[in-house]
């Protein structure tokens, strides 16, 4: 009875049983059996990008005379269905497989071949009218097709998802910066009291940190637009028409609306993946910025009654199973964990990028998985961060004013008038005796009360005045 649920598929290794109803074939089945490692599946974004490559390649191969029109049309129809996500359940392979990504490339080739067979009432696995290698993979090698798919999926994820979300997060912090421009607060360096600034100025730093990260990520795309497709096995273009890479890149640019081009030096973009490593590094830089911002927000909101408590963060859910009424900065904590995860993923990509040998880097699935996973993590985290926290942050004006008035570092404004040493003496006396700065200054006789009130004005200390 079990035999009725299986079919026999053939490849260069011989025969193998494959579940009767699935669209994948022999090579995919072998990978499933040999690499049942964890549950990390190849990202569907990469599968869709590979399908776009097959679609574009079929069109170009026909135009260049190495594929007939029937084969072209069958491949384009099936590949378009795969690229649109209609058959995502037919791509079960794990990330942890051969380092070239060959198994996943063949998974796509086999599914497209079998979709064509279905459409023509041919048996699954018959390779009629379209063969997975001879036709779907025509003029390609996994060595150029798989990294091309990573480039495409990464550019799409960054351009269509991550960058627009960052722009909204930048705008959210910009609105806070504008709204808080009149709130003067005490600054802190070394986690100790420092001179004043406005809460708006503090928020402007968060805004511009993210804006700088946005700019760096956007700039990294320049290295991802050139595609290795057309280099085939080692970059020479063996078994591909001379214009295949150039024309297929142009076709992919047309399909995606993104400025892809054919890499001038296929050897460089196939033997190494520096552009992908750089893009991942810029995601790490974004994570570093978001981690710092989350730490700032947690510190400024700590309390609510026994901490800094300068900010009120939105209260979204109970924070403790034992302490009634406790609310935690959970969005900051989630963001911090995402940031640390991305930083770790970047370390793996960096090692993988430098570990290629000669004409081939055999860490492609890891690089692609970590890069695309990081894009997804950062996009999702930034979206929830903005909607569930940043938009709802409110200042605690009473606490901010109280702390400002208590700070000894306002004495810094006196230093240009009476000198550093005398200003220090005022601060030490005030701290030791519990005096206000004004009381200490007048007691020591270093400044008149009129001059003190004129000089030690927090509103005048938030910008250069000499």
Swiss-Prot record:
For whether the record's keyword set contains Lyase, the answer is: yes
Which InterPro entries does this chain map to?
Answer: Fum_hydII, Fumarase/histidase_N, Fumarase_C_C, Fumarate_lyase_CS, Fumarate_lyase_fam, Fumarate_lyase_N, L-Aspartase-like
Alphabetical UniProt keywords: Cytoplasm, Lyase, Tricarboxylic acid cycle
- Pfam families in the record, alphabetically? FumaraseC_C, Lyase_1
Q: Name one GO biological process term.
A: malate metabolic process
Q: What SUPFAM superfamilies does the record point to?
A: L-aspartase-like
Catalytic residues (UniProt): 190, 320
Q: In which pathway does it act?
A: Carbohydrate metabolism; tricarboxylic acid cycle; (S)-malate from fumarate: step 1/1
Q: Where does substrate bind?
A: 100-102, 128, 131-134, 141-143, 189, 321, 326-328
Give the highest taxon in the source lineage. Bacteria
Site, as annotated: Important for catalytic activity: 333
One GO term describing the cellular component? cytoplasm
Q: Give me the reactions it catalyses.
A: (S)-malate = fumarate + H2O
| Other remarks in the entry | There are 2 substrate-binding sites: the catalytic A site, and the non-catalytic B site that may play a role in the transfer of substrate or product between the active site and the solvent. Alternatively, the B site may bind allosteric effectors.
Family named by the database record: Belongs to the class-II fumarase/aspartase family. Fumarase subfamily.
Name this polypeptide is given: Fumarate hydratase class II
Organism for this UniProt entry: Prochlorococcus marinus (strain MIT 9313)
Species lineage: Bacteria, Bacillati, Cyanobacteriota, Cyanophyceae, Synechococcales
UniProt lists the gene as: fumC
């Amino acid at each position: 009875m079990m035999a009725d649920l299986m079919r026999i598929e053939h490849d260069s290794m011989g025969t193998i049983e494959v579940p009767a109803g699935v669209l994948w074939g022999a090579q995919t089945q072998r990978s499933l059996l040999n690499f049942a490692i964890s549950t990390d599946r190849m990202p569907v974004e990469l599968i869709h990008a590979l399908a776009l490559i097959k679609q574009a390649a079929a069109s170009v191969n026909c135009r260049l005379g190495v594929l007939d029109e029937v084969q072209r049309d069958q491949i384009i129809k099936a590949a378009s269905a795969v690229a649109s996500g209609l058959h995502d359940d037919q791509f079960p392979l794990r990330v942890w497989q051969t380092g070239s990504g060959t198994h996943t490339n063949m998974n796509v080739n086999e599914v497209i071949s079998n979709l064509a067979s279905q459409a023509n009432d041919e048996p699954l696995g018959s390779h009629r009218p379209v063969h997975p290698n001879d036709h779907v993979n025509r003029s390609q090698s996994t060595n150029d097709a798989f990294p091309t798919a990573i480039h495409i999926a990464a550019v799409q994820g960054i351009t269509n998802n991550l960058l627009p979300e960052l722009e909204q997060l930048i705008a959210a912090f910009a609105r806070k910066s504008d709204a808080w421009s009149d709130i003067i607060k005490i600054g802190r360096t070394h986690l100790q009291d420092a001179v004043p600034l406005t809460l708006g100025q503090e928020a402007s730093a968060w805004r511009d940190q993210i804006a700088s990260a946005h700019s760096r990520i956007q700039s990294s795309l320049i290295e991802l637009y050139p595609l290795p497709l057309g280099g085939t096995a080692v970059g020479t273009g063996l078994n591909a028409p001379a214009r295949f890479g150039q024309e297929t890149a142009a076709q992919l640019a047309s399909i995606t609306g993104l400025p892809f081009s054919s890499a001038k030096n296929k050897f460089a973009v196939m033997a190494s993946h520096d552009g992908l490593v750089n893009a991942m590094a810029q995601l790490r830089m974004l994570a570093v910025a978001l981690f710092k911002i989350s730490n700032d927000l947690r510190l400024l909101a700590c309390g609510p009654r026994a901490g800094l408590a300068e900010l009120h963060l939105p209260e979204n859910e109970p924070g403790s199973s034992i302490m009634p009424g406790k609310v935690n900065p959970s969005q900051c904590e989630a963001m911090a964990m995402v940031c640390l995860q991305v930083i770790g993923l970047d370390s793996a990509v960096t090692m993988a990028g430098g570990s290629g040998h000669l004409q081939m880097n055999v860490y492609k699935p890891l690089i692609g998985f970590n890069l695309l996973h990081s894009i997804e993590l950062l996009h999702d985290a930034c979206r929830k961060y903005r909607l569930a926290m940043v938009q709802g942050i409110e200042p605690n004006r009473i606490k901010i004013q109280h702390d400002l008035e208590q700070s000894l570092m306002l004495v810094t404004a006196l230093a240009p008038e009476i000198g550093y040493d005398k200003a220090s003496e005022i601060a030490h006396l005030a701290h030791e005796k519990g005096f206000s700065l004004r009381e200490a200054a007048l007691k020591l006789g270093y400044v008149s009360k009129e001059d003190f009130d004129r000089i030690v004005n927090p509103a005048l200390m938030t910008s250069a005045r000499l």
